[in-house]
């Protein structure tokens, strides 16, 4: 099982694209479609490289999520990769969300837990609310 083009497209929409480095809502230097590793302010990239970085980043996160051994469908894998792509694998691994999934909690409980993760830099962000809604929906597809 692999992440889908649905996820790639959704990440492109959710992350937005910048061909020039900028600081994200949490103050982290970011470029392309949410790429942060090794980014310095002033960096610039091409659209083609932005897409390649996204695909490589998704592949890395996918391997980490698969190691948790909880995703049973493509929808679950897409949702959890999106979550970990945004927040980091450590936050997913240590989260109540993962605990709920592992114990087979109800759709409502899992959906509500996704929706708790909507803050960056101490601020509630509409973009994160939209993202968590998509992840919760995709998880159950």
Roles of regions detected by a PLM:
Residues 1-28, 35-70, 90-141:
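Long, amphipathic alpha-helical surface segments
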Residues 74-96:
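Mid-chain, well-packed structural core segment of small domains
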């Amino acid at each position: 099982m692999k992440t889908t083009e649905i996820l790639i497209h959704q990440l492109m929409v959710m992350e937005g694209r910048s061909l020039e480095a900028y600081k994200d809502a949490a103050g982290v230097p970011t470029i392309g479609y949410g790429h942060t590793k090794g980014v310095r302010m002033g960096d610039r990239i091409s659209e083609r490289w932005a897409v390649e970085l996204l695909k490589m980043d998704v592949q890395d996160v996918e391997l980490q999520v698969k190691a948790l051994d909880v995703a049973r469908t493509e929808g679950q894998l897409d949702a959890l990769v999106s979550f970990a792509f945004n927040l980091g694998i450590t936050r997913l691994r240590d989260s109540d969300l993962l605990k709920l999934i592992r114990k087979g909690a109800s759709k409502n409980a899992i959906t509500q837990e996704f929706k708790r993760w909507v803050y960056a830099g101490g601020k509630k962000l509409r973009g994160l609310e939209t993202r968590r809604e998509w992840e919760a929906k995709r998880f159950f597809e």
